[in-house]
Amino acid sequence: MVPLVEIKDIHKSFGDLEVLKGVNFSVNEGEVVCLVGRSGSGKSTLLRCINLLEKPDAGTIRVFGEDILHTRDVNAYRAKVGMCFQQFNLFNNMNVLRNCVYPQQKVLKKSREEAEKTAYQYLDHVGMREFAGQSVKTISGGQKQRVAIARALCMNPRLMLFDEPTSALDPEMVGEVLNVMRDLAKEGLTMIIVTHEMGFAREVADRVVFMDQGKIEEEGTPEQIFEHPKSERTASFLRASVNK
């Protein structure tokens, strides 16, 4: 099986700070991979490299069989890769429905009628259809993140990237977003998720990847990582996470 995502020897620095130090990993179609690790370990930078929001200094990234670092059409590539950020990145001057419709019209060249039909379908999927006419300024953080997920799904992505999607939410709103992501995992959507939600990673991930100091320290099934970590750094991180 050819991996959907294949990353080889990725390096990335910001000035004198080397953030990624030769990262290698792959993701198969339909797989859910959770990236975990301390803040500053390189998780989010790796995710941003996959979506070409950052360009690596060295190495190769192949997604859908394509060398994306030399793609001629970044927008066409990004249309196939959904991404949800910590801070939602919604259009605050638009209502909920328009947030989901506009990208379809702009990138996929859909008619308004077709785009609205798709938007309602995915807003319904994340439990936000009744808020379609509301300004995004008036809804909660958890609701904003669900709209952001719906917006990404409207583009019919083959791959979804989540960069700590619950970190900016109040604790009582975390569950509603994780429930949507659980449903997506059950539907077989390929997902790479940067998360500090260890219980969620343990429950949903097919594979957990622990990053430390810009490298992959250890990876395995949730049972292998959480029950039988081989690395002392992994074990130390997990102990600290449980004791928070």
Predicted regions and their residues:
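The feature captures the beta-strand-to-loop junction immediately N-terminal to the Walker
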Residues: 36-38
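Helix-to-loop junction immediately C-terminal to a conserved catalytic motif
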Residues: 51
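Conserved ABC transporter NBD signature motif
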Residues: 59-69
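ABC ATPase NBD coupling module
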Residues: 68-82, 112-113, 225-229
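Conserved ABC ATPase "signature" region
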Residues: 101, 112-131, 179
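Conserved ABC ATPase signature
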Residues: 135-139, 143
